[in-house]
Amino acid sequence: MYEVGRAGDFVSRQMWRHRARGSLYAAGAATAALTAVGALLGALLLDGGALRVSAAVAGVAAAAGCGYAWIRATRSLGQARRSSVGARSEREVRTAVRRTESVAAAYGLVLGSRGGDCDTVVFTRGCGAAAIEVKTGHGRVSAENGTMRVGNRVLHGDPARQAANQARRLSRKLGGRTVLAVVCVPGMRNRPFTTAAGVWVCSARDLQTVLDRAPRVFGAAEEARETMRSLWQAAPA
């Protein structure tokens, strides 16, 4: 199978940015905490009234700064953990794609100036085309009125619409040919289903069954591979 891109590359970069930011905030919180302790001790030990007041004010300000930095550090490190899980899900889908005997696959392919990249584009073994959005979760998946749930958790945004939009963009790149829109939740435990808009929702285990439904849009495997190569080379850096 011809492959381009790196599965989970975008969210991995996000993870490292969040980790770096979280580490800086954590270091700032530690520095502010030490400053606060020193200033408050000074307020207790100093003899001059004005100096004691100044030290106390500085200590309170440093303590407030410590609290703010700690909150930001916790938030950034939480975002880093979520990005790490998202990258892992995209790699799970890549593994599933490699088992489907597909002709070509691209990971993180940018299909337009808006809407971000498509997690995975696949040209199937039947010479069909699919745009896959990857979401994270384990349990029963349901979708209704623009909301998708995995177990009791509501996924952010509208994953089915995201997949449909990416499929539409890919279709335009392919001259209006039909593209299957898919949301893949690797840990989904129920059977594949379609939303009211015709977007397929499936687990990594059932991905091949769903991809086999993509109608043929290429005359031969070599045409599909060359098309993927051209799409990747033409995509914005």
Explain the meaning of each model-derived region.
Residues 1-116, 123-129, 140, 150-237:
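Surface-exposed interaction regions that form or flank ligand-binding interfaces
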Residues 131-147:
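Active-site ExK catalytic segment of metal-dependent nucleases
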